[in-house]
């Protein structure tokens, strides 16, 4: 059983009670909500004549279903208009802070909260979204929850959970030039399998993790859930503190020094005991691309589609289905796979640093004639920064469509969808069957830099060929 890890410390600090059956009642320090998983939860409160327990601990924005092409109200999509109108009314009724379109603070919830300084070390954070683990990059313990638990947090500010085991993933050495956090996390998930993290929290550590920027760390923690882990986190350090400092919601003046001292006390240390430790050599990672229908089905750009015997046992159960759906055969190179659509965005890779690196790859290039390409900033703030730096012009001149903030083609709840059997090069987090809107659409996950390279060539390409020129 783990002891004295950051996870253990934060868990004990937020444990309200031991519950029958072995679970714990955990206080949630920050609750993030959006338009899709909150309406039923608010409806349940109304049915029981309950109010939100701590409105000041809940923050709302709109992201999942918002259109990214035309955000004038009322939306052309009646369902989007209805869902966002409902969230507006619920937040007004319960006095919840709401960052709506046009506020300058709207965007994907897992992009907005960190950039506002809402996400801080030592917090417990919950949201009705699978990728809430993103916030673990700051040394918080962050969980995705279902609608019934959204209701519970609104009503009591607590949830019932079984304590997780803690696995440390120690990433040795450093990533080479042209290799990014997305490549590393896809490599880790492939190495361990998509079910390896069930019942675990993942602590990411080691020289390769320390070398990452905060936005790259968010990419790592964001995809913890894709490896089966309930959450993933990184111990806070000077990079963490520097990122948070002077944000809108960060501690100020004398409270800042107190916060730093407390945050440092939470770090795992040489006395920490983990349930399991896995070592990854980051220097061996190359640009990585998924070939199948789980994020664990990935290979390096120089590799070929694996045979069944070469696939992690946790992923073999779905390999045959992946071969058939994706149209790949064992031994086929992933490089030069033709692409139809390119998407840069999502809570995994829709931040300003992601747009910068993709724009650097694009340079003065134009996208291939057969390619339809989208770039969707993760928030209004990201969009503003990108425009100030001229990044939007780089994308538009290359042939990309520049869109407004939202989840967009990551899950295709709006009109941003694949059509028919189109193949997508995507910087998002899931490549499940039909994930990007078409029942037969196929998704290849990769870094934003790799998406940019694919857009130029019209096929899966090694981004290092562009960076080394």
From Swiss-Prot:
It catalyses: (2R,3S)-3-isopropylmalate = (2S)-2-isopropylmalate. [4Fe-4S] cluster binds at residues 347, 407, 410. Its cofactor is [4Fe-4S] cluster. Keywords: 4Fe-4S, Amino-acid biosynthesis, Branched-chain amino acid biosynthesis, Iron, Iron-sulfur, Leucine biosynthesis, Lyase, Metal-binding. Coiled coil: none annotated. It holds the Pfam family Aconitase. Its EC number is 4.2.1.33. Binds 1 [4Fe-4S] cluster per subunit. Pathway: Amino-acid biosynthesis; L-leucine biosynthesis; L-leucine from 3-methyl-2-oxobutanoate: step 2/4. GO terms for biological process: L-leucine biosynthetic process. GO terms for molecular function: 3-isopropylmalate dehydratase activity; 4 iron, 4 sulfur cluster binding; metal ion binding. It is an enzyme of class 4 (lyase). Catalyzes the isomerization between 2-isopropylmalate and 3-isopropylmalate, via the formation of 2-isopropylmaleate. Heterodimer of LeuC and LeuD. Belongs to the aconitase/IPM isomerase family. LeuC type 1 subfamily. This is 3-isopropylmalate dehydratase large subunit.
């Amino acid at each position: 059983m783990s002891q004295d890890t950051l996870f253990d410390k934060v868990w004990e600090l937020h444990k309200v009670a031991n519950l029958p059956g072995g679970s714990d009642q955990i206080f949630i320090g920050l609750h993030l909500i959006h338009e899709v998983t909150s309406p039923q939860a608010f409806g349940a409160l109304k049915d029981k004549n309950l109010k939100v327990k701590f409105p000041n601990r809940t923050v709302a924005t709109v992201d999942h279903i918002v259109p990214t092409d035309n955000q004038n109200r009322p939306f052309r999509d009646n369902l989007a208009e209805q869902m966002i109108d409902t969230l507006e009314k619920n937040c007004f009724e319960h006095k919840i802070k709401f960052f709506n379109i046009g506020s300058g603070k709207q965007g994907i919830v897992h992009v907005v909260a960190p950039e506002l300084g809402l996400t801080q070390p030592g917090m417990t954070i919950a949201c009705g979204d699978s990728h809430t683990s993103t916030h673990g990059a700051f040394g918080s313990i962050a969980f995705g929850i279902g609608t019934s638990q959204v209701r519970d947090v609104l009503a009591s500010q607590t949830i019932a959970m079984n304590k997780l085991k803690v696995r440390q993933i120690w990433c040795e050495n450093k990533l080479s030039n042209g290799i990014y956090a997305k490549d590393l996390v896809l490599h880790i998930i492939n190495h361990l399998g998509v079910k390896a993290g069930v019942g675990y929290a993942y602590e990411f550590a080691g020289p390769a993790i320390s070398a990452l920027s905060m936005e790259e760390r968010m990419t790592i923690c964001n995809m913890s859930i894709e490896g089966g882990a309930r959450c993933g986190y990184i111990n806070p350090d000077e990079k963490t503190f520097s990122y948070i400092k002077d944000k809108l919601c960060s501690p100020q003046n004398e409270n800042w020094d107190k916060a730093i001292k407390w945050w440092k006390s939470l770090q795992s240390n040489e006395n920490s005991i983990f349930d399991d430790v896995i070592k990854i050599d980051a220097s061996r990672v190359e640009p990585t691309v998924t070939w199948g229908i789980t994020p664990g089905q990935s290979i390096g750009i120089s590799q070929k589609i694996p045979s069944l015997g070469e696939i992690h046992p946790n992923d073999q159960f779905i390999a045959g289905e992946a071969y058939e759906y994706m149209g790949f055969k064992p031994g086929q190179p992933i490089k030069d796979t033709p692409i139809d659509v390119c998407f840069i965005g999502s809570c995994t890779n829709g931040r300003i640093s992601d747009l910068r690196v993709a724009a650097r790859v694009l340079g003065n290039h134009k996208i291939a004639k057969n390619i339809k390409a989208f770039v969707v900033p993760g928030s209004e703030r990201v969009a503003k920064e990108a425009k100030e730096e001229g990044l939007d012009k780089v994308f538009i001149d290359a042939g990309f469509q520049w869109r407004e903030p939202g989840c967009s083609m990551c899950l295709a709840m709006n009109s941003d969808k694949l059509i028919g059997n189109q193949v997508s090069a995507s910087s998002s987090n899931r490549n499940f069957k039909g994930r990007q809107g078409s029942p037969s659409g196929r998704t290849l996950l990769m870094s934003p830099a790799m998406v940019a390279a694919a857009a130029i060539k019209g096929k899966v390409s090694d981004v290092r060929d562009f960076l080394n020129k």
